[in-house]
Swiss-Prot record:
Keywords: ATP-binding, Nucleotide-binding. ATP binds at residues 37-44. Belongs to the RuBisCO activase family. This is Ribulose bisphosphate carboxylase/oxygenase activase. Induction: Transcribed in light but much less in the dark in both normal air and 1% CO(2); the nitrogen source has no effect on transcription. Constitutively expressed when grown on fructose. Transcribed separately from rbcL-rbcX-rbcS. GO terms for molecular function: ATP binding; ATP hydrolysis activity. Pfam families: AAA (PF00004), RuBisCO_activase_AAA_helical (PF21228), RuBisCO_small (PF00101). Transmembrane segments: none annotated. Activation of RuBisCO (ribulose-1,5-bisohosphate carboxylase/oxygenase; EC 4.1.1.39) involves the ATP-dependent carboxylation of the epsilon-amino group of lysine leading to a carbamate structure. It comes from the Bacteria. The gene is rca. CDD domains: RuBisCO_small_like.
Length: 415
């Protein structure tokens, strides 16, 4: 099957890899290329196609390997794979790269529900150290004075804002946001259906019918078209015999004729897939479960502005007071707007020294999704960390990314 490589993607990858193998006098080349973007847009697959076209060998690390029960193992793994790749360049005499898939999933911090471990710190520190000293990468407990070959590092992820800020600065990591435009998407989808007799016009209509869907959606659509034939095959041999027929049969694997890949059939199947997506989006069961776990009923909270507390005054007369006297109206309005959009809220603090490195820490332990909880949590945070920076963070629970970061208190106590 002839898959399509987007020229823009290929150029970016080829330039970064080649530049790291050249000796450019007086030029400091970033070692890491960070490819980020929406889920399912083919970042990893486009990398694989580009590597194959360029004849580049790849050493892979998964984001799931960046955590371990033993502190230091993931950092050691990165150093070991880097040294192995440098040795491959030397032995085979060809370009080789180290690729880390889903770096943000393994080393990022999405919210206070994501634990920040020793391994997370060590992974970030190790990548920073390698980016600064690419020819001097040592294993813990040993030292080799022989300089290594420089190994370009390619990392992929969805949201690099969750990573440690010094790691992604321009001198260490070059960023490339991958969101294929229509022509690129038509080319990629055309490659997916290249063997199925779909015309260029049909591919364009299919893409235009589902403009908000990722590349992975169309790949899954092609797989779904085979479901009808597989269902007929299962009915033909029987549920009780399908295991022996497929796995342990002298007849060989079953053969299937080419399914119906007409545009109308594709759009019909795609609509079923979109309907399943919408059911998940509208169910919001996780919100209900979280509310039950916190002992709250599944009902929207009343606006804070309508809540008043009565405290006895010195003369014995009860006077109503605002629920949040020292939180500005602008901050309260921003909280309402974030929650109205279906987002979650959390608060973070940092002292003056750690502010320069971006080492923020959470003020609470849960997502806040009700205005009354947000106000009370913020009041507690401001009171407890009076001499520090405090910021409000809005989180999109569907995309698992931050949409708002606003500093609402500074060390001098101003809001």
């Amino acid at each position: 099957m002839s898959y399509y490589i987007a020229p823009r993607f290929l150029d970016k990858l080829a330039v970064h890899i080649t530049k790291n193998f050249l000796n450019l006098p007086g030029v400091r080349v970033p070692l890491i290329l960070g490819i980020h973007g929406r889920k399912g847009e083919g970042k990893t697959f486009q990398c694989e196609l580009a590597f194959e076209k360029m004849g580049v060998e790849v050493t892979l690390i998964s984001g799931g390997e960046l955590e371990s029960p033993d502190a230091g193992d993931p950092a050691r793994l990165i150093r070991l794979r880097y040294r192995e790749t440098a040795e491959l360049i030397k032995v085979r005499g060809k370009m080789c790269v180290l690729m880390i898939n889903d770096l943000d999933a393994g080393a990022g911090r999405f919210d206070e529900g994501t634990q920040y471990t020793v391994n997370t710190q060590l992974v970030n520190a190790t990548l920073m150290n390698i980016a600064d000293n690419p020819t001097d990468v040592q294993l813990p407990g040993s030292y080799d004075s022989t300089p290594l070959r420089r190994v370009p590092i390619i990392v992929t992820g969805n949201d690099f804002s969750t990573l440690y800020a010094p790691l992604i600065r321009d001198g260490r990591m070059e960023k490339f946001y991958w969101e294929p435009h229509r022509d690129e998407k038509v080319g990629i989808v055309g490659g997916i259906f290249a063997e199925d007799g779909l015309s260029q016009r049909d591919v364009e209509k299919l893409v235009d019918s589902f403009p908000n869907q990722s590349i992975d959606f169309f790949s899954a659509l092609r797989s779904r078209i085979y479901d009808e034939q597989i269902r007929d095959f299962i009915h033909q041999v029987g549920y009780e015999n399908v295991s022996l027929r497929v796995v342990n049969s002298l007849e060989g694997p079953p053969a299937f004729k080419k399914p119906d890949f007409t545009l109308s059939h594709l759009i019909e199947s795609a609509n079923f897939m979109v309907a399943e997506q919408k059911r998940i989006e509208t169910s919001q069961l996780v919100d209900e479960y979280n509310r039950l776990n916190r002992g709250r009923s599944y009902q929207p909270a009343s606006p804070v502005a309508e809540i008043a507390t009565s405290q006895p005054s010195p003369n014995g007369v009860n006077q109503p007071q605002s629920a949040s006297p020292h939180i500005s109206l602008e901050t309260q309005e921003q909280i309402r707007q974030i929650l109205a959009q279906g987002h979650k809220i959390t608060f973070e603090h940092v002292d003056n020294r750690r502010f320069r490195t971006g080492s923020w820490q959470s003020c609470g332990t849960i997502h806040v999704d009700a205005e009354s909880d947000a106000i009370s949590t913020l009041e507690s945070c401001l009171a407890e960390y009076r001499g520090e920076y405090v910021r409000l963070v809005g989180i999109d629970p569907k995309a698992k990314r931050r949409v708002v970061e606003t500093i609402i208190q500074r060390p001098n106590g101003t809001n």
